[in-house]
Amino acid sequence: MTVAPFDAKALAQGLEQGAQALRLELTAVQQQQLLQHLALIDRWNRVYNLTAVREPAQMLTQHLLDSLAVVAPLRRQTRATAIALLDVGSGAGLPGVAIAVACPEIHVSCVDTVSKKASFIRQVGVELGLTHFQALHARVESLASSNFDVITSRAFASLADFVTLTEAALAPDGVWMAMKGQVPHEEMAVLPSSIEVFHVEPLQVPGLDAERCIVWMHRKG
């Protein structure tokens, strides 16, 4: 299969239009950092198989804009304050890198159990010059007592497994931000009794003809 070349100009235009649709104000530097992340995914993917998506234009929509779609909801939830966020099963750094770029006030940690993916994310942080950012090659269970304010995941596990595996790393008043496709009613129905869904937030990803949502959760009481 022939893969389309990395057309930086077209991708820059697509990113700008997507950010406008999401009502995100990105500086020229932030836009360049996001495009650089995309270029790194495209380059490393040929060797490390970071994602099944091969076309750069599809990467822009399905990965980058999909990740940026959570920025405004995240800022509303955290009131744009300095918090610590953990991205579990980050893979190619999604959504963690996009959040770190768009929200420099947030300290982002991306964790993945696959060494090559953690190495890639670490390299992205270095090349993009991200501060308040780290990549971890570890199992999330090893991060107990880390007190993250927000724990997110884009394609990690069922909601029950997600909260069970990460609860020890969540701050007492922290929240989970699970990125999902269709509203996962069946998964929500079998959450541990101590966990509560307090909001299901629909997302509209520019250029993506698919349902997306955030399932917001916290501990009861």
UniProtKB/Swiss-Prot annotation:
Residues the entry annotates as binding S-adenosyl-L-methionine: G89, L94, V140, E141, R154
The UniProt record lists the keyword Manganese: no
Any one GO molecular-function label of the UniProt entry: rRNA (guanine-N7-)-methyltransferase activity
Gene Ontology CC terms, in alphabetical order: cytosol
Record keywords, A-Z: Cytoplasm, Methyltransferase, rRNA processing, S-adenosyl-L-methionine, Transferase
Reactions it catalyzes: guanosine(527) in 16S rRNA + S-adenosyl-L-methionine = N(7)-methylguanosine(527) in 16S rRNA + S-adenosyl-L-homocysteine
UniProt keyword Methyltransferase, yes or no: yes
Main location as per UniProt: cytoplasm
Enzyme superclass (EC): transferase
E.C. code: 2.1.1.170
Compartments where found: Cytoplasm
Function: Specifically methylates the N7 position of guanine in position 527 of 16S rRNA.
Homology family: Belongs to the methyltransferase superfamily. RNA methyltransferase RsmG family.
Name recorded for this polypeptide: Ribosomal RNA small subunit methyltransferase G
Organism: Methylibium petroleiphilum (strain ATCC BAA-1232 / LMG 22953 / PM1)
